[in-house]
């Protein structure tokens, strides 16, 4: 079995795979101060709830956009499971991930994993929209190369900024708005936040298509993907587990090269 972990700025998503099948998935809050011991304490009840024996997991893959947690997670995995995690990057995804980009090393691990999974599933070209703390758009061109994209404030990040700066506007639930014209303050905020995100994404994707000179499938992932995608005019598919799937693919490639895996572990220790 494989443990895949996607460490985001707000949430951390964990999945356990048996071969290509995702057996279990959990979403927990990201706490940037956690030590490896605290992460192990968090993992144990998750495993226990599904009857998973940690030592039965024979591999781990990690994508982290929180540098202070990368080593903590690697240590937690090593001590609890007894394996060295494959840390996703443009380098470890070589062969699955090609980039026509000035500095591939600066591409976030989550963006690499998304691109790997999207290209594997949909071919090239393909566009990924990942709704998280940031709304990321990744563009893979007709050659199969990652060429860049967009990083914008995420829907919840934008909402929190509004709540914190507008004294009379309190926090609301981000439920589906019923109309663009809100009939009270709460409805108006819901319409502005949700439809604003929908139209922002659609507008950016159409600009990307014009720059490319052709259209492509657009796959949405992330915690709010379903809510936005059903109102979108450009999103063509939803894959909530896209990042985890990308981690699985990167791990499978690395697992066939033990020497490379060991080198990666040593260089990041």
Language model segments and positions:
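Phosphate/pyrophosphate-binding loops at sites that engage ATP/ADP/AMP, CoA/4′-phosphopantetheine
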Residues: 43-59, 205-215
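Short glycine-rich, Thr/Ser-proximal phosphate-binding strand/loop in the N-terminal lobe
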Residues: 2-45, 55, 144-171, 175-179
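Glycine-rich phosphate-binding loop of actin/hexokinase-like ATP-binding domains
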Residues: 27, 124-160, 217-218, 236-243
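Short beta-strand-loop/turn "lid" adjacent to the catalytic site in phosphate-handling enzymes
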Residues: 50-107, 143-149, 154-155, 183-194, ...
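ATP-binding/phosphotransfer module of carbohydrate and carboxylate kinases, centering on a glycine-rich
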Residues: 2-4, 30, 158-269
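Conserved phosphate-binding catalytic cores of ATP/NTP-utilizing and phosphoryl-transfer enzymes
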Residues: 93-126, 248-255
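Short glycine-aspartate micro-motif
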Residues: 2-6, 59-61, 126-130, 219
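Extended, charge-rich low-complexity interaction segments
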Residues: 116-129, 133, 264-269
């Amino acid at each position: 079995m494989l443990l895949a972990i996607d460490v985001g700025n707000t949430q951390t998503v964990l999945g356990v795979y048996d071969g290509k099948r995702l057996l279990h998935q959990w979403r927990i809050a990201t706490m940037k101060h956690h030590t490896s011991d605290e992460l192990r304490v968090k993992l144990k009840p998750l495993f226990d709830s599904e009857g998973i024996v940690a030592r039965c997991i024979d591999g781990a893959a990690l994508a982290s956009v929180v540098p202070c947690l990368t080593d903590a997670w690697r240590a937690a995995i090593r001590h609890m499971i007894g394996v060295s995690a494959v840390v996703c990057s443009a380098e470890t995804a070589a062969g699955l991930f090609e980039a026509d980009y000035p500095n591939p090393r600066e591409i976030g691990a989550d963006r690499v994993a998304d691109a790997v999974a999207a290209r594997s599933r949909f071919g090239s070209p393909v566009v990924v929209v990942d709704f998280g703390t940031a709304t990321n758009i990744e563009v893979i061109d007709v050659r199969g190369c990652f060429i860049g994209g967009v990083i914008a404030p995420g829907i919840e990040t934008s909402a929190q900024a509004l709540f914190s700066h507008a004294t009379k506007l309190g926090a609301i639930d981000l439920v589906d708005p019923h109309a663009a014209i809100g009939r009270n303050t709460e409805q108006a905020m819901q319409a502005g936040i949700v439809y604003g995100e929908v139209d922002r994404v659609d507008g950016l994707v159409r600009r990307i298509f014009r720059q490319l000179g052709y259209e492509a499938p657009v796959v949405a992932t992330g915690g709010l993907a379903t809510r936005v995608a059903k109102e979108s005019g450009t999103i063509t598919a939803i894959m909530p587990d896209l990042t985890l799937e990308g981690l699985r693919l990167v791990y499978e490639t690395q697992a066939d090269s033990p020497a490379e895996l060991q080198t990666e572990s040593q260089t990041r220790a």
